[in-house]
Swiss-Prot record:
One GO term (biological process): defense response to bacterium
GO cellular component entries: extracellular space; membrane; other organism cell membrane
Tissue specificity statement from the Swiss-Prot or TrEMBL entry: Expressed by the venom gland.
Function (record text): Potent antimicrobial peptide against Gram-negative (MIC=0.25 ug/ml against E.coli ATCC 25922, MIC=0.5 ug/ml against P.aeruginosa) and Gram-positive bacteria (MIC=64 ug/ml against E.faecalis, MIC=64 ug/ml against S.aureus). Adopts an amphipathic alpha helical conformation, that may allow to partition into the target membrane. Low hemolytic activities have been observed on mammalian cells.
SUPFAM superfamilies linked to this entry: Cystatin/monellin
Protein name per Swiss-Prot or TrEMBL: Cathelicidin-related peptide Oh-Cath
Similarity remark: Belongs to the cathelicidin family.
Composition skew (Acidic residues), residue ranges: 125-151
Subcellular location: Secreted; Target cell membrane
Pro-sequence residue ranges: 23-161
Alphabetical keyword list: Antibiotic, Antimicrobial, Cleavage on pair of basic residues, Disulfide bond, Membrane, Secreted, Signal, Target cell membrane, Target membrane
Disulfide pattern: C81-C92, C103-C120
Signal sequence extent: 1-22
Amino acid sequence: MEGFFWKTLLVVGALAIGGTSSLPHKPLTYEEAVDLAVSIYNSKSGEDSLYRLLEAVPPPEWDPLSESNQELNFTIKETVCLVAEERSLEECDFQEDGAIMGCTGYYFFGESPPVLVLTCKPVGEEEEQKQEEGNEEEKEVEKEEKEEDEKDQPRRVKRFKKFFKKLKNSVKKRAKKFFKKPRVIGVSIPF
């Protein structure tokens, strides 16, 4: 009888071990993954205001049980709540003119613990910059034409001035783009 008990215990133990999940992480639905990413953005971005999910479209290939990399794409918007208040996001309304951020995140579930890399940048900022740059260029061209008409300078001097102004504008644009980097956050996720 004693041998039967140990054999039974061995079989039950083997089944229990084989029946447990071999995943190194807790399975996440797309909604849970996005909520976690928004929470991490709010805690690590250094912003004064909390951001809340505006839109998220789950990709058809999202697999909560996958051990491979998973991609997130979502949009968040600034709320009236401050980070220091530590309020629930459900209590926070969107700001009327709040900043809207387009975010892309990558979960690396193959790592132990899993890692999230999140990149968020303002939506529509590129279009606004192009419009501003176009307006500035037009104003400068008009200003240059007026200056050239007023002064009676040799043609060579005018060409050099025009060239250096274009060069100066180009450097300004590149400097603006360089210093307006999107926020990138990387964290490991303990499950």
